Structures are given as structure tokens and as C-alpha cells.
Amino acid sequence: MNSDLSINPAIHPEEMKPFRDSYWVIPGRFLAGAYPGLDNMLTTRKRLTKFLQTGIDRYYNLTGEHELVPYDEILAEEANLLQMPVIHHRFSIVDRGLPSKMLMFELLNSIDAALDNNHKVYVHCWGGIGRTGTTVGCYLVRHGMSGEQALDKLAAMYATAGQSRFHPRSPETREQMDFILNWNES
């Protein structure tokens, strides 16, 4: 499993982000944040093209199937124009809720497999705060941090995202924070 969670000072990740409501978990490789689509199809296409130009080819959507306007077909069309294979995964977690332990385990395994195979990953929910933060926190614990360290690291990474100005902490609920603090895979 890839556990390079350090930030390379030669990389300026903020300049590489495809949009402001996101943050790097592993600079240049693992991005997390808000829903990448918008109600306007043209703007969604432009935004998704920025993601693709960043090299992100694995998308982990934590929203429910009918929760937001789907973007996976537009993503596939734009990726096809760039001759870039992409995969859109859906791991549905209820808004402000918690996944089952098994779902989180499967999600983390899929993210690790993508990173181990040199893919670039984007994990998102609607706002990029609760479900996304819970996933990132558990990822950090999986890769050697304590729950407290993971929450501290998550706070520092999330502070670089645009939405942190309006919602200052990730994850969103006390239950989501406790899920990270208590995460283990035994």
C-alpha cells in the first residue's frame, strides 16, 4: 500500500487543484473535495476537463444514486475526447451519515489499489465535508496515523479548500469524527 502522506515542498499543490473546493491528501495523486458537477452542463464539462487535465482518472462518488445530477456520462465523454480511460465508482453513504465498516474497508481498498497502480484519485460527496472527510480520516489512520493525528492532518488539509471558509471543520458531525477516532480494520 502506498503510504507517502508527506508534502513535497517542490510541488505547489494549490496551483494544481482543478477547483477551489478541494484539497490534496497526497499532492498530485489523491484529491478530495466537493461534488465536481454543476446544474449547468457547459460549466460541468469545463470543470471535469480541468480534473482530467490534472490527470485524475479514478472518481469515488460517495453520494446516493439520485442525490445529485449525475456527471459520469459527461466525464466519460470528456475523457474520451482526451483519449483518457477513467473509472467512476459509487460508494453511497447517507448525507451526514456513516458507512458500514465493510463499506469503508472496501472503499479504502479500492483507493489504495488505484494509487498502487499509479492512478490519480478524486474522492467526493456533495460538499466535500462530512462523508469525504470521514473517508480521508480513515485513510490516514489506515496509513499509520492515530485517530487524533488523522483529525489534525485532515483539519490542515481541509483548511486549504474553499468551502472551509463557510464550514470550518471536516468531517461534519461528532459521529463522523468518532468513526475516524475508532477506525481499525481488525
PLM features: residue spans?
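Cys-dependent protein tyrosine phosphatase-like superfamily
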Residues: M1-Y122, G127, T134-S186
